[in-house]
């Protein structure tokens, strides 16, 4: 079972905790990223939340597809996987934010990097700090 939360959530959290935790993790990530978007003056809190939900569902879906075909990556270690999935998530979510055409490219890609630094820092704390994976 896999989660719908960023590309890395598919690998790290769902196999351990199941669907309920997966949905909870998605909700936490959407809220964290919406707050970062709001802090970056992306738009209203509602718009930031909607955009965060859209991009996270998209990156989660794409992450699941990529993960299904990336068996050789599984044995590379936690840090490597966080780096790979983090980079993919920035590209996917930055691309989605670009397609929404709400802001200039520089602001869009700054937002994509910032929201993922926050969400992957959270994921790192959960996976490495708490779960010790």
Q: Model-predicted segments: where are they?
A:
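Juxtamembrane/disordered regions of integral membrane proteins
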Residues: 1-133
């Amino acid at each position: 079972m896999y989660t719908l939360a960023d590309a890395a959530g598919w690998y790290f959290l769902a196999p351990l905790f199941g669907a309920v935790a997966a949905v909870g993790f998605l909700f936490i990530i959407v809220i964290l990223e919406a707050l970062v978007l709001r802090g970056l003056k992306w738009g209203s809190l509602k718009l930031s939340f909607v955009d965060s939900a859209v991009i996270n569902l998209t990156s989660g879906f794409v992450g699941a597809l990529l993960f299904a075909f990336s068996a050789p990556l599984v044995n590379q270690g936690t840090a490597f996987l966080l780096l790979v999935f983090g980079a993919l998530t920035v590209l996917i979510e930055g691309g989605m934010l670009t397609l929404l055409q709400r802001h200039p490219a520089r602001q869009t890609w700054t937002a994509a990097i910032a929201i993922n630094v926050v969400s992957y820092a959270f994921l790192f704390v959960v996976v490495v700090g708490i779960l010790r994976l």
